[in-house]
Amino acid sequence: MSDAIAKDAVNTSSEKEPVSATPELKTSGSPDAAVSSGDKKKKKKKKKTNNIKNIALLYPDEKYPEGEWMDYHQDFNLQRTTDEEKRYLTRDAENQQRWNDMRKGAEIHRRVRKNLQNKLKPDMTLTEVVNIVENATRKFTGVDENGDHVDRPKSQGVGFPTGVSLNHCAAHFTPNAGDQTVLRYEDVMKVDIGVQVNGYIVDSAWTVAFDPKYDNLLQAVREATNTGVREAGIDVRLTDIGEAIQEVMESYEVELNGKTHQVKPCRNLCGHNIAPYRIHGGKSVPIVKNGDQTKMEEGEHFAIETFGSTGRGFVVPGGEVSHYAKSAEADGLPAPSLSRAKSLLKTIDENFGTLPFCRRYLDRLGEDKYLFALNSLVKHGIVQDYPPLNDVQGSYTAQFEHTILLHPHRKEVVSRGEDY
C-alpha cells in the first residue's frame, strides 16, 4: 500500500457488499457384470474440494518458511564485534515471534495471490477479484465464516483493503458496494494485498496485464523494485535508494499505439517502513533522488515499492474514496459529538484499530447508513481518508512491491515468491 506525498482528498457516497469434478464410471469387462441401461448406476459427483484452509493446519509446529535472504553490499553491515553479536543474540531471541509472524503472513500472501492468479481473467468484476483475495486471506488466517477469532478480530487477517487500481489510477482504489467495474483485456491492474498477523503487516503488490504490449512497462517497474530491494540496508540513506530506483526505471521505454514513452517514476509515491498495526510507520522510501538523508536502521521492516507511468509521473487525488484508517493522533482529539459517529468509531476501534479499512468491511460488519458519520470522523481528524491517486487520463501505471526485514547481517525479502 503506497505512501503518498499528496494528502488532500474528496468524499462522495455509495454502499453494500455483497468446483466439482465428476469421475469416470468404470464397469467390469465380465459379461456377468453387464446391466441394462435402466439399471446403470448414476454418476456420482464428488463434493467440492477446497484447498484453502487455516494455514496453522499445514504448519502444526508454527514454524513458517523464511523469505529470500540477501547479503548487504555495505562492508560496515558485515563486520560485527563480539559484544554486538552477544547483544543481537539477546534481541534475536526476543524477536523470533515477530519474525515468525511476518513469515506466516508472507506464506499466506503467496498462497492468496497464487489462488487469485489461477482464477484471474478478463471480464471479471473488480468486486469478484477483491472477494477472492480477502475471503482466501480470512480462511488462511482462520478468520472465516465459522467466526474464528471473533473475540480478537485484530489478531490476524486482512492487512488493508485489496488495491485493484486500473490504468492511470496508480493506488488506493478498491470497489465500494455496488461498483460494477469490469477488468478488461486491455487494462493494467495493480493488485496490492496486505496480510497481518498480530499486527505485523506483509505488504506486497504486482501488476496484471493480459496484453503483451505492456510487457516493457511491467519489466521496468519490476526491475526498479528489485533494485530498491538490493540497495536497501542498515545505515543506507533513503535518497540513495531512490536515486538507484530512478536510474533503472528511466532506462526503459514502452511503445503503445505507435508512440514511444519513457517509463517515469511516479515521483510523489513512495515505499515506507511498517509499524505494528500501522501500515505507514513514519519513514518514506522515495523512488527518485530527493535528498532525504534519513537512514534505514537495524530491525526495521520496510515495504519497498515502485510505480512507473507512461504519463507525467505525478499523481493527484481524485474519485470516490474507499480507503480509510484511524489517525495516529486520534486518541488525543476530542471525542465525536454525533452519537452515530461515536458508535461507528467504536466499531472501527474494535475491528481495525489503526489498520486501514474500507467501506465494504463496514458493510460486512452490519454497519449501514454510516457515510455521514464516517465523513464527520474524517472532518474532525479522527479518521484519515485515502482517495484514489491518479496520473493523467489515458496513461498507464504499474507497481511492484516487496516487504523486507533488516536483520544485522543480512536482509530477508519475506514476501518473495516464485511469481515475483
Swiss-Prot record:
Catalytic activity annotation: Release of N-terminal amino acids, preferentially methionine, from peptides and arylamides
Cofactor comment: Binds 2 divalent metal cations per subunit. Has a high-affinity and a low affinity metal-binding site. The true nature of the physiological cofactor is under debate. The enzyme is active with cobalt, zinc, manganese or divalent iron ions. Most likely, methionine aminopeptidases function as mononuclear Fe(2+)-metalloproteases under physiological conditions, and the catalytically relevant metal-binding site has been assigned to the histidine-containing high-affinity site.
An individual GO BP term: proteolysis
Residue positions binding substrate: H172, H280
Spans annotated as Disordered: 1-48
PROSITE patterns, per database record: MAP_2
Pfam family, one: Peptidase_M24
Subcellular location: Cytoplasm
Name assigned to this protein: Methionine aminopeptidase 2
Organism name: Lachancea thermotolerans (strain ATCC 56472 / CBS 6340 / NRRL Y-8284)
Gene: MAP2
